[in-house]
Regions:
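Helix-loop-helix hairpins and the membrane-proximal interhelical loops
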Residues: 1-55, 137, 188-293, 378, ...
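Transmembrane alpha-helix interface/packing and boundary motifs in multi-pass membrane proteins
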Residues: 24-38, 68-80, 155-160, 254-266, ...
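Short helix-coil transition sites and intra-membrane helix breaks within transmembrane domains
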Residues: 29-39, 77-87, 120-124, 260-269, ...
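Re-entrant/interfacial helical elements at transmembrane boundaries that shape
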Residues: 38-48, 61, 76-96, 127, ...
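Membrane-interface alpha-helices at helix entry/exit sites of multi-pass transporters
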Residues: 55-59, 96-113, 283-296, 320, ...
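A structural-propensity feature for long, helix-poor, extended segments
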Residues: 65-76, 83, 293-318, 322, ...
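Membrane-embedded alpha-helical segments of transport systems
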Residues: 66-71, 112-124, 132, 176, ...
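Membrane-embedded alpha-helical modules
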Residues: 108-225, 335-454
């Protein structure tokens, strides 16, 4: 009970509540605008959170992460253009429902299923992360090295059809984290005589380049487009009752989201695809899938919204991120000398419970906001892509420069932006580079500390 009160007390602070509202509502808006996405938004905001209290910065980023998929369902359903990549399957059944004049029903079902999946995922986070944190001290350097290596392998295997490319990009990420000071001997390595590489390549500089700047370049080089989304008419609460008729589908899909969200490299799309396939195979009306099936819509939305909370389980309990967004959040912990893992549950239990309550509250805030503001969001969808590109470009460079007031960082980030654009054009994954940088650092330190005992 003492931990419970500590978490509630932390969440009751005005700055935390403000950060949660800004992150939650901002995440919905960002998710609703095709071409932006949570990775871009979090990458841009990340430098600003370093000067904030850990709970404030993490709450804001969690708000964006957890709410963006709610918003991403809106354009997927109304204009057949997913707001985020993980809402791709939502358009399969959501858009046909809109064509049949049931757009309000589809949106209401999507919101309700997302809320169900979000709360289910948070419940599993609260139950499983302390248990995993208790087991974690039994892991030595060798076990943690193997866990990080497994994470790299799973990230690579998750990109079916691109396993070789994903493996090469993951190794490139591992190489990037070796540049600069040796983590054990503190000697220079791979600087090639350039002084600006002596302190290493900053993860945030790479993240902003690969995600934010590459997306800005992509939007600026693409034909200008203004999506057309018409206002929605009808009761937005109808889907809440209908969801209860399909609660088995919602629960199973949420379970898929939790299990796959805990596994590094799998993420929302894999969970969404597997839950959608399961729902179709077990449905009494499988022929409706892809033509406006409420079960298909519920399965996809419940699964992808259960993932954010589930992805926090290995991050909080082991300090191992499972995807790019949790890797970004890991940097917020490190900046404030708060190390995720078993010690987090011993020394900063109030922060842990504060994050639990923040996740619950963000789902409530987003659900209420969407029920009353959907038509407002349909207007926001109509933002021209060129305007988005310019805004992302400006904010990204401001974020990079604010890290160390360095123009060199801006040039490095721009280089990674070009690399990210090339990878997008070639339809190659970006995530393995980021996870290679994060998990590669863990692997190196743990391997070298374990070697004397081999």
């Amino acid at each position: 009970m003492e931990n419970l009160y500590a978490g509630l007390e932390m969440l009751a602070r005005w700055d935390v509540v403000l950060a949660l509202f800004v992150g939650s509502i901002g995440g919905v808006i960002i998710g609703a605008i095709p071409g932006v996405g949570p990775a871009v938004a979090i990458a841009i905001l990340l430098p600003a959170t370093f000067s904030l209290d850990p709970i404030v910065g993490l709450t804001m980023l969690l708000g964006i992460y957890g709410s963006s998929m709610y918003g991403g369902a809106i354009p997927a359903i109304l204009i057949n253009t997913p707001g985020t990549a993980v809402n791709a399957l939502t358009s399969y059944d959501g858009y046909p429902m809109t064509q049949n004049g049931e757009g309000h029903r589809a949106l209401s079902l999507a919101y309700s299923a997302s809320f169900w999946g979000g709360i289910f995922g948070i419940g599993c986070l609260i139950l499983l992360s302390p248990v995993l944190a208790l087991i974690a001290p039994m892991f030595g350097s060798r076990e943690i090295f193997l866990a990080a290596l497994l994470g790299i392998i799973l990230v690579v295997l998750a990109h079916r059809g691109q396993i070789f490319a994903a493996g090469v990009l993951a190794m490139f990420g591992i190489f990037l984290q070796t540049v600069g000071l040796d983590a054990v001997t503190y000697t220079q390595r791979y600087t090639f005589g350039y002084s600006f590489l002596s302190s290493g390549i900053n993860l945030i500089v790479v993240v902003l380049g690969l995600f934010a700047l590459s997306q800005a370049f992509f939007l600026l080089t693409a034909p200008d487009n203004v999506p057309d989304a018409k206002p929605v008419q009808g009761k937005m609460t109808a889907g809440i009752k209908e969801l209860m008729k399909h609660k088995r589908v919602a629960t199973v899909a949420s379970a898929f989201g939790v299990v796959l969200g805990m596994i590094p490299g799998t993420g929302e799309f894999t969970a969404q695809f597997m839950s959608y396939t399961y729902a179709q195979k077990t449905s009494k009306n499988p022929e409706l899938f892809g033509k406006g099936s409420p079960e298909g819509l519920i399965a996809s939305e419940a699964a992808n919204n259960a993932v954010p909370a589930a992805a926090m389980i290995p991050l909080l309990a082991l300090g191992i991120p499972g995807e790019a967004l949790t890797a970004m959040m890991l940097s917020v912990f490190y900046v404030h000398n708060v190390i995720p893992g078993p010690q987090l549950f011993q020394n900063h239990i109030d922060l842990v419970y504060g994050l639990y309550f923040a996740l619950i509250l963000l789902n409530v805030i987003v659900m209420i906001f969407l029920l009353f503001s959907t038509n407002l969001l349909t207007k926001i969808i109509r933002v021209p892509t060129r305007f988005l590109g310019v805004m992302i470009l400006i904010l990204s460079f401001v974020g990079v420069y604010s890290l160390r007031n360095s123009l060199t960082d801006c040039m490095i980030s721009a280089s990674f932006g070009v690399l990210g654009l090339v990878l997008k054009r070639l339809n190659l994954p970006i995530v393995p580079i980021i996870l290679g940088m994060v998990l590669g650092g863990i692997m190196e330190v743990k391997l070298r500390s374990a070697m004397p005992r081999l």
